[in-house]
């Protein structure tokens, strides 16, 4: 049976843990609100850009349907961008990403895969399994600004345009709301694969020239997609962390209540024993006086 001192120490420890996990839960909630607002405000813009691109590409001539960011090519190397966290305490967030990644790899020839890992968990998994990691981005999601998204987008575009990879997929968590996040596998490059049968043989006069419109538009669409994915991933991670910390806080409170009950019970028993000793001593003294 634990001593009174041991129980007091345990109660103090659990009390400290309760304060810590509650603080982490509160911090995650603050971060979620900020990221959620940015993510949900960006989504309509991202969707509208995609609608514009789809409409524009349908109207392009053969010359511009061969744009390197639009045209499908023979696939020799497949790029895979994987978003995980750098920190723990986020429940099954990383586990679900890694499980999805394993299934994706199982459907591909691993020797033809090139990986871009965001977060230390993806990097550790890929390194331990000797996969080809092209670039590692550690603590990258600490900055979810558009300028940081552009840096990642340029790295990926450089490899695609220089034929280091022939297509690009991303595995990440799509942030739907604070209670729902889903793992997605999405093809990012080529941007819009359209077969020759699907195109419209129509010609338009573009002012300024079509190349001046198309190049920056395609670049903006890809950079915006990367930014959206970064925001969704960061918001989803915090949502998982908040839920994990909430469960940890609830469990810590249950343990605290249980230990406090044991402590009070032990103290009560100790006081009872002391009272019995005192009573017995008084009775003994009375007997001696007689």
From Swiss-Prot:
- Its chief place of residence is membrane
Q: How does it sit in the membrane?
A: Peripheral membrane protein
Concerning SUPFAM superfamilies, the annotation shows: ATP synthase (F1-ATPase), gamma subunit (SSF52943)
**Biological processes annotated in GO:** proton motive force-driven plasma membrane ATP synthesis
A GO MF annotation of the entry reads: ATP binding
Q: Which GO terms describe its cellular component?
A: plasma membrane; proton-transporting ATP synthase complex
Q: Which keywords appear in this protein's UniProt record, sorted alphabetically?
A: ATP synthesis, Cell inner membrane, Cell membrane, CF(1), Hydrogen ion transport, Ion transport, Membrane, Transport
| Entry's localization field | Cell inner membrane
Q: List the Pfam families.
A: ATP-synt
The family line of this record is:
Belongs to the ATPase gamma chain family.
Q: How does it assemble?
A: F-type ATPases have 2 components, CF(1) - the catalytic core - and CF(0) - the membrane proton channel. CF(1) has five subunits: alpha(3), beta(3), gamma(1), delta(1), epsilon(1). CF(0) has three main subunits: a, b and c.
NCBIfam families membership = ATPsyn_F1gamma
What's this protein's function?
Produces ATP from ADP in the presence of a proton gradient across the membrane. The gamma chain is believed to be important in regulating ATPase activity and the flow of protons through the CF(0) complex.
* Name of this chain's protein: ATP synthase gamma chain
* Species assigned in the record: Dictyoglomus thermophilum (strain ATCC 35947 / DSM 3960 / H-6-12)
């Amino acid at each position: 049976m634990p001593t009174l001192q041991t129980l007091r120490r345990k109660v103090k420890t659990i009390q400290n843990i309760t304060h810590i996990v509650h603080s982490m839960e509160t911090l995650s909630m603050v971060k979620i609100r900020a990221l959620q607002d940015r993510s949900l405000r960006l989504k309509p813009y991202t969707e509208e850009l995609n609608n514009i691109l789809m409409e524009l590409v349908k109207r392009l001539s053969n010359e511009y349907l061969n744009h390197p960011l639009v045209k499908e090519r023979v696939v020799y190397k497949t790029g895979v961008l994987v978003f995980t966290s750098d920190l723990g305490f986020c429940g099954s967030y990383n586990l679900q990403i890694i499980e999805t990644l394993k299934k994706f790899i199982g459907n591909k020839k691993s020797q033809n895969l090139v990986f871009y890992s965001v977060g230390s968990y993806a990097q550790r998994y890929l390194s331990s399994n000797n996969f080809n990691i092209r670039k590692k981005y550690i603590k990258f999601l600490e900055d979810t600004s558009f300028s940081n998204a552009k840096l990642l987008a340029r790295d990926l575009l450089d490899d695609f345009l220089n034929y280091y990879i022939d297509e690009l997929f991303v595995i990440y968590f799509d942030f739907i709301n604070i209670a729902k996040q889903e793992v997605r596998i999405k093809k990012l490059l080529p941007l819009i694969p359209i077969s020759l049968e699907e195109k419209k043989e129509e010609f338009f006069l573009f002012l300024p020239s079509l190349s001046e419109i198309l190049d920056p538009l395609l670049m903006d669409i890809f950079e915006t997609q990367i930014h959206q994915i970064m925001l969704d991933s960061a918001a989803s991670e915090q949502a998982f962390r908040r839920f994990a910390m909430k469960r940890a806080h609830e469990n810590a409170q249950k343990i605290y209540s249980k230990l406090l009950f044991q402590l009070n019970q032990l103290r009560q028993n100790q006081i009872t024993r002391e009272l019995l000793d005192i009573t017995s001593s008084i009775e003994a003294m009375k007997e001696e006086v007689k």
